[in-house]
Amino acid sequence: MLVRQNIHGTSLNSLRITRIFLLVLFVMSLLSGCKVYKFNQASIPPEIKTIYVRFIDNKARYNNPQLSPQLTDKLRQKIVSQTRLTQVNNDNADYDVSGYISQYDVSTSGISDQKVSTNRLTVSVNLTLLNRKTPGAEPRNISASRSFDFSASLTLPQAELQLNDEIVRNLADEIFNQLFSDW
């Protein structure tokens, strides 16, 4: 009887090992068919070589004087560093990007004990991508909007000092992804 239990126990262990092996093999076969995608890889037609990113104007009701130049510079830097495109400053560029900051508003986003605890700064940008290399190509409109929460104990200028780098980085990333990614 003791021998029978050992044989039975051994066959159960063998069965478990076989099942685990088959499961691992199945998962590996599924993963082998997957491609690795790079989220920072831009999708640009080969004939496009130059881009003109115009100054992004601030047409929002409230005007943060630092935002327009910093966002424009960050977007230009991102495009030059993560694509093969060359930034030019003339109307002969293959791609022409123009636009403006359309919204820069603060609203209440959190209330605690009947007092404002958190404010939200919402920044929106509207851009147009013009493809001069492809005759008859329609301009592509792009909208990017991000919200940033900050403590209600801060004034707007104090919050802007804390949030400025994050605002510029996040908006530039979103604009870049909408301009060049096929996601």
Where are these regions (language model features)?
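Structured catalytic/translocation cores of nucleotide/phosphate-coupled proteins
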Residues: 74-75, 96-100, 171, 182-183
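Sec-dependent bacterial lipoprotein signal peptides
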Residues: 2-34
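Compositionally biased, intrinsically disordered linkers/stalks adjacent to structured regions
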Residues: 160-183
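Structural motif marking the loop-to-transmembrane transition
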Residues: 14-18, 60, 160
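Extracytoplasmic/periplasmic, Sec-exported soluble proteins
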Residues: 63-71, 113, 117-121, 156-168
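A structural "domain/chain start" motif
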Residues: 32-76, 80-84, 133, 177-183
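Surface-exposed short loop/turn segments
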Residues: 39, 81-83, 88-141, 146-158
